[in-house]
């Protein structure tokens, strides 16, 4: 798998935008997901040897047997797997696995030249280390195979780091057979959060779970060391089929010592047979086929989703067949991960795209199109689509309006456009959508027409489509307008979002996204939408409804979220625990208190599992703070800063905790420490300004609050607070001018409009005050 989870973003996306979004500290979520995990479910394999063939292995229980035990019987499947990217997801660095040029090859980036060479049969790179000095590092493992290969370097604390200089393994005629940097348009040097020695490129957390089988991270917070282990170094048979020891015993003995259920399962932990006995038939000769039996489970899709989804791990020990949301928390269709219409933007790894699709809604599974053992398509070109969609109807110029043998005649050219990640890795969008240049013209979303016709604009493309079909394009995904309205804080955004959330005909992942996009102030209609979401049979919708309640009044949170403390899925239980962490015990019934304590223990365990990350420590610190445990909260937030001094939310949250504790002088010190690390971080300057206000140092506060607006002019909240500070110091004209300027960019910002009404009223200008009061009234009613 060339998909490297150490990069959770498109290298070509603007660094400043994504960095800012990652560092928003209010209600910290790690990589747009809660980071978690908890108690350990120990599994291993028949051979208890701790080391074999140089691989670090788990040797705890008799369950994982290794792919070699499988391919001895399943030769056809094994042969396909041996040639797959799953097989080559990770390997020990040797003459067979290493594809890159290590014959004293040189590569220069950011003014520094790295040299790739061999010594005593081993592979090395001389490159910039975390201290900025050129150092020799041994390449320990290869990572991926095509279209690029990365290399892992092991440090003394057993931390593996992914080098940001990768090998382009494509043929030379395609531009390959060269070294290249994954961030070619940026200047990533030591100290940068994206430097290869930093947490963002750490294999143990960012990559390992998807590139090896049955991974155990084994981080020790007391020593800040790892002892990461796996059952198999790459993605083996058991990564998808589950531990195979019982199946091996069954196959060898044919006299099963199992229960009746185990006999019927042949000792397998999961049966991936959802397509068995299923036929796709056409109700009429020219119609699309219909599945003979509705898809009855998500087993296959969830097995793929463990890696082919943008998600955070909330528990360790996933084995195929267990509920996905017991172990992972997936990202929804939010910006900047997706465009407003749901098209992929950042690296989202397929699952979130596919769940939006009409194919998924009609029962298609991953293996309908992909051979699960080779990873290849079941047919090439339009022939794959023609297994369901009539070629005579769709593979014709009357449908696609392009030359029959041209690139535009390919089904995927229009319905699965590519986005290139990691510089050279194009990946197709699996939302399988109808091109919508009309949406592009109105909302700024991309479309596949202009992906090829780059010399034309979206309105031209929309006109062409209308001429071809006599109408605007019509797609299955209908939520773009609502999500775009939410981004723009449009007056009707909330109503549009509620409509999407309530429409069972929309994809569940879109309905879930609509719920989390509902923003404060949460009126009765929004709370009703969330209450309905909490009762929804779809788990993603329930989880999103909980997330959306973070801005609800305490009484509403308790009333609505308490029943979810006993949900069947762990991701939902711990979200409910986090949401209700600050509820006083005397407000809870005995049953609620018991459920909250149990779910809170799961939440704490989930963050403890990720104690190697500053994000996990901040999450835990905030949780303790809401529970009233200030001592442990301070400890965790300080630990986060020590673990990763570049993680800005740790400073902001610790300072905010000191505010709650009445220790603003200490908060000021923390914020100034953070500003030394990130002098251009607007959040820290804004927080420092507020701290100085509380410390009665108004002039100093005004400097910091203004600095925040300069560093982040697009943040309406910063402008609003700065204007309030100006007004409080008697600078009414300057305050009003600042607010009016911000209102031009954010015409529907309630705080700005309300402040203008208030400021004009305070100076006796009733006409202007009424104008803005009426505007606010209209906006609120909408």
Residue ranges, per PLM feature:
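Helix-start (N-cap) detector for alpha-helical repeat units in TPR-like alpha-solenoids
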Residues: 508, 539-542, 570, 614-615, ...
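Primarily the internal scaffold of c-type cytochrome electron-transfer domains
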Residues: 4, 47-53, 61, 76-144, ...
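Structural marker of alpha-solenoid helical repeat scaffolds
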Residues: 521, 536, 552, 567, ...
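Structural signature of tandem alpha-helical TPR/SEL1-like repeats
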Residues: 524-525, 556-558, 592-604, 627-639, ...
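Short coil turns that connect the paired helices of HEAT/ARM alpha-solenoid repeats
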Residues: 502-506, 534-540, 565-571, 609-611
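Amphipathic alpha-helical scaffolding segments comprising HEAT/armadillo-like alpha-solenoid repeats
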Residues: 491-501, 523-535, 553-564, 587-604, ...
């Amino acid at each position: 798998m060339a998909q490297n989870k150490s990069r959770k973003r498109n290298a070509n996306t603007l660094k400043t935008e994504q960095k800012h979004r990652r560092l928003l500290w209010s209600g910290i979520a790690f990589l747009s997901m809660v980071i978690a995990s908890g108690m350990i479910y120990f599994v291993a394999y028949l051979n208890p040897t701790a080391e074999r063939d140089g691989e670090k292995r788990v040797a705890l229980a008799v369950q994982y047997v290794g792919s070699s035990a499988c391919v001895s019987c399943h030769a056809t499947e094994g042969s396909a797997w041996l040639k797959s990217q799953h097989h080559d997801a990770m390997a020990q660095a040797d003459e067979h696995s290493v594809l890159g040029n290590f014959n004293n090859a040189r590569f220069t980036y950011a003014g520094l030249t790295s040299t790739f060479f061999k010594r005593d049969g081993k592979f090395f790179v001389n490159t910039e280390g975390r201290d900025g000095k050129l150092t020799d590092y041994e390449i320990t493992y290869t990572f991926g195979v095509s279209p690029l290969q990365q290399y892992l370097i092991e440090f003394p604390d057993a931390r593996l780091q992914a080098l940001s200089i990768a090998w382009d393994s494509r043929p030379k005629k395609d531009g390959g057979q060269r070294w290249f940097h994954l961030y070619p348009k940026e200047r990533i040097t030591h100290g940068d959060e994206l430097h290869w020695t930093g947490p963002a490129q750490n294999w143990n957390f960012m990559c390992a779970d998807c590139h090896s089988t049955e991974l155990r991270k084994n981080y020790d917070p007391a020593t800040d060391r790892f002892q990461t282990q796996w059952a198999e170094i790459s993605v083996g048979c058991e990564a998808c089929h589950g531990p195979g020891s019982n199946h091996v015993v069954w196959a060898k003995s044919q006299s099963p010592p199992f229960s009746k259920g185990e006999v019927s399962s042949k000792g397998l932990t999961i049966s991936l047979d959802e397509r068995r006995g299923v036929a796709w038939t056409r109700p009429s000769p020219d119609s699309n086929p219909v599945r003979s039996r509705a898809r009855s489970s998500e087993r296959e899709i969830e097995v793929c989703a463990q890696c082919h989804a943008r998600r955070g791990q909330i528990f360790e020990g996933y084995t195929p067949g267990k509920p996905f949301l017991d172990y992972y928390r997936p990202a929804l269709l939010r910006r900047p991960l997706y465009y407003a219409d749901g098209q992929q933007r950042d690296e989202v790894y397929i699952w979130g795209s596919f769940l939006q699709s009409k194919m998924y809604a009609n029962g298609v599974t991953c293996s309908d199109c992909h051979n699960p053992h080779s990873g290849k398509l079941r047919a090439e070109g339009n022939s794959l689509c023609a297994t369901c969609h009539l070629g005579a109807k769709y593979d014709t110029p009357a449908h696609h309006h392009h030359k029959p043998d041209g690139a535009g005649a390919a089904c995927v050219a229009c319905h699965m456009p590519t986005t290139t990640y990691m510089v050279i890795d194009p990946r197709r969008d699996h939302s399988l959508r109808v091109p919508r240049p009309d949406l592009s013209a109105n909302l700024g979303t991309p479309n596949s027409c202009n992906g090829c016709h780059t010399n034309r604009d979206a309105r031209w493309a929309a006109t062409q489509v209308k001429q071809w079909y006599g109408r605007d394009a019509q797609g299955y995904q209908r939520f773009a307008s609502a999500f775009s309205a939410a981004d723009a804080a449009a007056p009707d955004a909330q109503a549009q979002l509620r409509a999407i959330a309530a429409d069972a005909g929309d994809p569940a992942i879109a309905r879930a996204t609509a719920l989390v996009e509902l923003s404060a102030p949460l009126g009765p209609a929004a709370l009703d939408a969330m209450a309905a979401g909490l009762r929804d049979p779809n788990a993603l919708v329930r989880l999103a409804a909980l997330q959306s309640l973070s801005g609800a009044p305490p009484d509403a949170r308790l009333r609505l979220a308490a029943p979810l403390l006993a949900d069947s899925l762990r991701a939902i239980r711990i979200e409910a625990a986090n949401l209700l962490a600050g509820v006083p015990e005397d407000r809870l019934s005995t049953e609620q208190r018991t459920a909250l304590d149990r779910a809170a223990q799961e939440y704490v365990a989930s963050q403890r599992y990720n104690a190697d990350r500053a994000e996990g420590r901040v999450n835990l610190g905030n949780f303790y703070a809401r529970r009233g445990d200030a001592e442990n909260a301070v400890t965790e937030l300080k630990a986060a800063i020590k673990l990763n001094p570049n993680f800005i939310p740790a400073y902001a949250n610790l300072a905010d905790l000191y505010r709650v504790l009445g220790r603003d002088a200490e908060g000021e010190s923390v914020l100034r420490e953070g500003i030394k690390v990130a002098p251009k971080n607007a959040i820290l300057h804004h927080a420092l300004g507020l701290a100085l206000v509380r410390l009665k140092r108004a002039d100093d506060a005004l400097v910091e609050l203004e600095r925040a607006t300069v560093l982040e002019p697009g943040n309406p909240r910063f402008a609003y607070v700065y204007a309030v500070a100006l007004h409080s110091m008697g600078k009414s004209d300057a305050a009003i001018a600042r607010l009016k300027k911000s209102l031009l960019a954010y015409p529907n910002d309630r705080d700005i409009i309300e402040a203008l009404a208030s400021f004009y009223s305070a100076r006796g200008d009733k006409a202007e005050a009424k104008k803005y009061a009426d505007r606010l009234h209209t906006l609120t009613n909408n």
